[in-house]
A protein has these predicted regions:
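Short beta-strand element of the alpha/beta-hydrolase
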Residues: 64-73
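Gly/Ala-rich beta-loop-alpha elbow adjacent to hydrolase catalytic centers
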Residues: 191-200
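Conserved acidic catalytic loop of the alpha/beta-hydrolase fold
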Residues: 168-189
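The feature captures the conserved acid-bearing segment of alpha/beta-hydrolase catalytic domains
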Residues: 218-298, 302-304
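Catalytic active-site module of serine/aspartate enzymes centered on a nucleophile-bearing elbow/loop
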Residues: 313, 317-323
Length: 323
């Protein structure tokens, strides 16, 4: 699988763009909770929480490896479903291509909102901030050539696919659940987005069933060998955390064992006049450093900046953009 992973992904996406109108032939579908913990109080009463929620579909004649989808910050499995402008999302596109698909709401998010921590959720009037940070444009203006439909209904749907985290952000809790999923379903390919990127890096260390990773605009907690954290990994993100983390060399080597492809979209500025945009420029550059370090050690990591291969106007959500 390793030598042809990148080519296969490209060919599949091109082929699946030619979506036919035949009825989807689904052999099996269902849902379940995975992972999590059980708390017990002094009276012996129980509380089940911190699990993930999984919805899956298996097409007739499914391919060997299923696809597991991890969403990003402030999102849930809707990321991979129908796009804000009403087109089929990756869920159906890859189902039509013959892949079993597993859409996950990570612990403390969406349908898996039964967290184990006390938390107060208040409305955050921040949608214009996310419009900028997700690189649709600079509110209220859209970027020229952006691959995002410019109508009120699309923007309304876009904002309504956001959901809060019911508890603190905890990559260990998230990755425990994803690892349990891979252990349950067997070998598969992990498709991650944004905050799901570091969740993917963590999950890879906890299961042998991840055969490849495709990550869209990963951000945060990039693992580097102890004592080799590059200066570019030491910057503090808008989330007030350092972008890179140090891990033992034996752990770092785990990332050389599966093919990894990473994608970044368009409108990445060359200066830091808009920190919420420049953060993604820095992440693209950092992932190129990360890829080189792993490839020098025998890894198979490819970083693709979409404008450099002729795809322009992509936002932070390339999987749901118009192109």
């Amino acid at each position: 699988m390793r030598p042809v992973f990148i080519l296969s992904i490209i060919l599949l996406l091109v082929g699946c763009k030619q979506r036919d109108e035949r009825v989807l032939m689904v052999d099996e579908q269902g849902s379940f909770a995975i992972g999590g913990t059980v708390l017990v109080d002094s009276l012996g009463h129980t509380y089940h929480g911190d699990h993930a929620y999984v919805f899956y579909q298996k097409p007739v004649g499914a391919r060997k490896y299923p696809l597991v989808f991890a969403h990003g910050v402030g999102q849930f499995s809707k990321t991979w479903e129908t796009t804000p402008d009403g087109r089929e999302g990756f869920q159906n596109i890859f189902l039509r291509c013959g892949f079993s698909v597993y859409l996950v709401d990570q612990p403390r998010r969406g349908n898996a909102g039964r967290g184990t921590e006390s938390v107060t959720i208040s409305p955050a009037f921040d949608e214009e901030v996310w419009f900028n940070r997700f690189r649709v444009g600079i509110w209220p203006d859209y970027f020229e050539g952006v691959q995002f439909k410019r109508d009120k209904e699309t923007l309304d749907q876009y904002f309504r696919q956001m959901t809060p985290t019911i508890g603190t952000t905890d990559f260990e809790v998230y990755s425990d659940a994803y690892a349990a999923l891979f252990d349950k379903i067997g070998p598969g390919v992990f498709i991650t987005h944004s905050q799901g990127g570091p969740v993917g890096w963590n999950t890879l260390l906890k299961t042998r069933n991840i055969k490849a990773i495709a990550s869209y605009e990963p951000g945060g907690a990039v693992p580097f060998p102890e004592g080799q954290l590059p200066e570019e990994a030491k910057f503090i993100t808008l989330s007030k955390k350092m972008e890179g983390i140090e891990v033992p060399m034996s752990v770092f080597m785990e990332y050389t064992k599966v093919p990894i492809v990473i994608y970044y979209g368009d409108n990445l500025p060359e200066t830091d006049e808009r920190p919420e945009l420049y953060e993604w420029t820095r992440r693209l550059y950092l992932m190129k450093i990360w890829a080189k370090m792993l490839n020098d050690l025998g890894g198979d990591v490819t970083v693709i900046h979409l404008p450099e291969v002729g795809l322009h106007g992509n936002t932070h959500f390339p999987m749901s953009d118009l192109n």
